[in-house]
């Protein structure tokens, strides 16, 4: 995806931002440009804390990559998988791991802002070690594991801030939330603007409508 993107083919583009349809910019284009010009060469990700990593390596991470998850496009065309899938799912219901462990696994948010140097490094690693990417087949939420595991040990010299993704995301809301992360609304505006985030998430039509108008008005003025 990165290698085929028009942005990657344009050598003058220095930064790449992974976002989804539930993200919204909370800084103006000029503010964002100035930020990355000031911090040129730095990249931004969010890695789970050391304490979280130690705890989640016991069950949360292995459940994602040591169990078989049949979400990959085209898997249902494989008759062998279709034959054995009911048996595999029954065994895995008891958290019996059928796949080998990945040593020194790390994880975090899959929303990042990378300098081109990190993009090129990641693509080089995939090209040099294609089996590592192949190992990610039939896993789930693997975009929260693959790059973090790849980049963790080299984060310092790659200039990656590992606890700052430049995203405003509320995983620990002080008000009731139907889902996590919190779906943001106008009550979150001040906290968003006081943060250093360039994107906020999650936003949804209807619920976040007033917040989006406030952010749009603010970024037009700046």
Model-derived features: positions:
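ER/Golgi luminal nucleotide-sugar-dependent glycosyltransferases, focusing on the catalytic module
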Residues: 1-222
């Amino acid at each position: 995806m990165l290698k085929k993107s028009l942005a990657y083919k344009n050598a003058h583009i220095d930064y790449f931002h992974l976002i989804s349809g539930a993200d919204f910019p909370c800084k103006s284009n000029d503010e964002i440009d100035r930020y990355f010009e000031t911090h040129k060469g730095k990249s931004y990700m969010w890695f789970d804390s050391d304490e979280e990593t130690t705890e989640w390596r016991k069950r949360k991470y292995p459940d994602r990559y040591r169990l078989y998850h049949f979400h990959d496009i085209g898997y249902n065309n494989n008759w062998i998988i279709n034959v054995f899938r009911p048996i595999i799912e029954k065994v895995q219901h008891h958290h019996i791991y059928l796949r080998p462990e990945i040593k020194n696994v790390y994880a975090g948010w899959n929303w990042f802002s990378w300098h081109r140097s990190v993009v090129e490094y990641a693509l080089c690693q995939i090209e040099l070690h294609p089996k590592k990417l192949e190992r990610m087949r039939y896993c789930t939420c693997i975009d929260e594991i693959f790059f973090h595991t790849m980049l963790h040990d080299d984060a310092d010299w790659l200039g990656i801030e590992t606890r700052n993704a430049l995203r405003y995301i509320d995983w620990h809301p002080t008000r009731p939330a139907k889902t996590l992360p919190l779906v943001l609304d106008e009550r979150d505006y001040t906290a968003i603007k006081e943060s250093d985030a360039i994107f906020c998430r999650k936003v949804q039509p209807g619920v976040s409508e007033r917040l989006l108008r406030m952010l749009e008005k603010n970024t037009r003025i700046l």
